[in-house]
Amino acid sequence: MGRVIAVMDVGGTSIKTGAVRFDDGDDDSRIEVGPGLPTNSNEAADVVLDSLAAGVDAALDVAGRNVTGLAIAICGPFDVDNGISQMQGVHKFEDIFGIDLRAALRERSTVSGLPIRFARDAESAGTGEALAGAGAGVDRVLTITVGTGLGSCLTDHARPVEFIDGFGVEHLAMRETPWGGRADDVLSAHGLAERLGVDMADLRAAVEDPANADIVRDHGTRLGTFLAPVVAEFDAHVVVIGGGFSGSFGRFGPALQSAIGAVPVRPAALGPAGPLLGAAQLTFRP
């Protein structure tokens, strides 16, 4: 019969929903992507929690009656074991700091007694792409998600590597850059929006505007310059760029590749399905 996992991927601006269906004794999986919803991550706690609960209900609708669990990929810092947000000073989710999301979602959604398990969003994206996307068939894949923040995941044979010589891979975004701030602030899509003087909601249009081409290419160069020593440090065989900004890869990707050097750089191939697959795999099929 297999298992059906309802999944949602929670980012700083939007929630992606869907379901992953695993067949017993088979490595194959089927992914169904559901509706996307706004996160409202800069609103008061009640608004944010109601938005997350709406995402849960949407994912459960996609999964249907035979659902056996709920997997949530979520940005961080986040305590995935206890389901508690630790986000402060990262431009999102400030008002749900310290809240037990499992309990809050049981109160506000129809999840009832189903098991709820959390995974880091970058690890979910990286695992999905390593299993069936741009990193499939490559031993060591460094996935960088470029969205409201900057996420990082290193996989070895599609399994996350948490530490390199004692350094937590997920903390890459906290490293300082030569451009006056942490990578999370400077090299994320939020950082580019600040350079362009636009709101996040208007970033896609601004990136596509030819008048901004030089700044967008320079952003790719900066990201590649930052990542080049990381690729060597992590012994990555390919770099995959995911997150909301990956849709504009054609605008910044060549400059990024030039700055990184010989190791190939690819845009994520699975779109919203990647983190959904990865989250279900990490939480219910480890």
Task: Please identify what each model-predicted range represents.
Residues 9, 71-75, 119, 142-149, ...:
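Short beta-strand segments
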Residues 84-98:
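A charged helix-plus-loop insertion that forms the helical arch/lid used to bind
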